[in-house]
Amino acid sequence: MSQENLKNTERYFFRASAADFKKIPGSPIAYWASENLFAAFKSKQLRDVADAKQGMATSDNGRFLRLWHEVSIDETCFDCKSLAESECRSEKWYAYNKGGTFRRWFGNNEYVVNWHKNGEELRGFVEEINKLRPGGRLKNQEYYFLENITYSALSSGLFSARYNQSGFLFDTKGSCIFPKTISMNVLFSMLNSNVVQAFLNILCPTLDYSSIGINAIPVKSPDRPVPVKDLLGIAKADWDDYELSWDFSSLPLLHTNHHQPSLHATYKNLRAHSRGVTEKMQCLEQENNQIFIDAYGLQDELDSGVNIQEITLSCNPYYRYGGDKTDAELEAQLQADTIAEFLSYAVGCMFGRYSVDKPGLVLANQGDTLADYLRQVPEPRFMPDEDNVIPLLDGEWFADDVTERFRTFLRVTFGEQHYEDNLAFIEASLGKDVRKYFTKDFYTDHVKRYKKRPIYWLFASPKGTFSALIYLHRYRQDTVSVVLQYLRDFRKKLADELSRQQTIVINPNAEQAKKTKAQKAVEILKKQLLELDDYERDTLYPLATKQVQLNLDDGVKFNYLQLGSALKKITGLEAKED
C-alpha cells in the first residue's frame, strides 16, 4: 500500500489501547471512546452513591397484575409507604412499576399488583413455585414502596429515567435506583443527560440496561443547580392530561385557560400552548445536558442539543408519532387524535366515569350506579345514561344513541352559538362524520388506547347491524337483558321500516327509481333481520338467561371472554401476559 493510500485509510480507523479499556468496569471494547470519556471512569461509580435494584417477578403476571383501570378505584392504593402499612390496609391492588416505553422524567404508570395484606396471596404462590424452581422472585423487599428513580431495563433505543414517589412496588423490567449519599435531584438529572447516555453506550452496547451497567456509571456532582423540578413538573402535567393517568383530572380542551368561543379556536390555543411547553422542555433538557457536560469536562466530545423527537411529551407529535411524516402530516394526526380523545372523554361522561362538573373519576367502582353519580354530582349539566346501555348504530334509530348523546355533550361543553361550526371542525379533523366515526373507528381506538383492556364493551351482532356500548364498572347481572331489550326494540324498528319499503315496492303510483331503491332496501333489511334473529336466538338470549356475574378483580381479559361471542372480538386479547 502506498504512503498516500495509507494516509487516506487512517481516517477510517480508531486508535485505542487495551489499558484504556481496562479503566472501564467490565473492560468493554469501546474503540471509539475519547481520552476524556475514559478518564471519567476514574470517578466514583453509581454503586457508591446509590442502590440500583431489580424488583419482583410474579411468575404469573396474568394472575397478579392488572392495568389500573381494570379494577375498582376504591380497591387500589397509590400511596402506601411501607410493607408494614400494606399489612394493615384494605386495598387489594398497589401501584406497580413495569418499565415501559422510552419516556423521560415521568410516566408509564399503568400497572397495579395484587399485594393485599402484604402480598399474602403472591407470597404463598411464590413459596410453592420456589419448591419446584428455586429462585429469588420477590427481590429487594426492603426497597418496596420507597421513593425512587425507575428506568426500563430493556430498550430499543435511548435510556430514560422517571421519578416515582413513594408508593410503588416494582418489577424486574422496571428496575429502580435508590439514592444513598447523593441528592435525588442531582442523580435524576444526571441519568437523563446525554452524558450518561454516552457512558451507557459503552457499558451497555446491546441496549440491555442491566443493573451491572447502571451501577458502573461514573458519578460527578455539578457545580450549579439542575432544572429538575421544572422538567418533572412539565412531564407529569403532560402525562396527567390523558385518560390513562390515574391522576387524570379533565380534558385539556375543556380547561378554562385554553377555552375559546369555538372548538377550533380552543384547539389552536391548546396547540400553541403545547408547542410552547415542548420548546421550554427542549431548552431545559439542553440546559441539563450542558450542566453535566461541564461537570465531566466533555465539551469536546458532546454538545447539549436535544432532538425534538427526544422530547418525551405526548403533546409533542415528533415524539408521539416519530417516523418520516411531514410537519403537516404530524399536525393533522395530532389534531385528529386530540378530537378522538374529546369523543372518548364524552363517552366517559355518558357513562358517568367522568363529569364536566367534577374533576377526575366519578363512577369507577364495581356496580356503581346513577344514584352514586348523583351523590357526587347533584346537579349535572350533562346527565349520564341511566341503564348503562348506549346504542351505537349507523342510523338515527334511537334518540339516546351515542351520536345523539355526543351532540348534546358538544352543546353543553361549547354552547349552542357555534355548534354547527364546532361539529364541522370535529368531522374535518376526523375525516368523517361523527356517526361514522362512532360506528367504524371508536371501538378500535378505545381498545388501542386502553391497551387491549377496554372499559367500555361493545355488544355487536356478527355483521355489526346492531351494536351497543356498556361500561364495565357499571355492569350488573341484568345488563345483558337490557341489551337484549334494545336489540328487540331495534328489530321492531327495522321490521317497521321493511314494511314501509315493501309498500313503496308494490305501490303502482311510485316512481320506478324509488321502487328500485326501495327494493334494494328490502333486500338489505331482510338480511339484517335474519342476522338479528340469529344473534338473539344463538347468542344474546342464552347469555341473558345465565345472568353472568363478573368480578373486576379477575381483569378484563378473563371477564370479556365470559360474555363470549356477544361482544365484538378483540384480536390478541387471549395472548399470554408479558
Where are the predicted features?
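Polynucleotide-recognition surfaces of large bacterial nucleic-acid defense/processing enzymes
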Residues: 1-148, 225-352, 356-387
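General structural signal for alpha-helix termini and helix-helix connectors
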Residues: 216-219, 507
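Helix N-terminus capping/helix-initiation residues
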Residues: 17, 34, 55, 193, ...
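Terminal accessory regions of large proteins
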Residues: 252, 279-283, 290-293, 297, ...
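Structural motif corresponding to the C-terminal cap of alpha-helices
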Residues: 195, 218-221, 235, 354, ...
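Basic, amphipathic alpha-helical recognition segments used for DNA target recognition
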Residues: 142, 152-216, 223-234
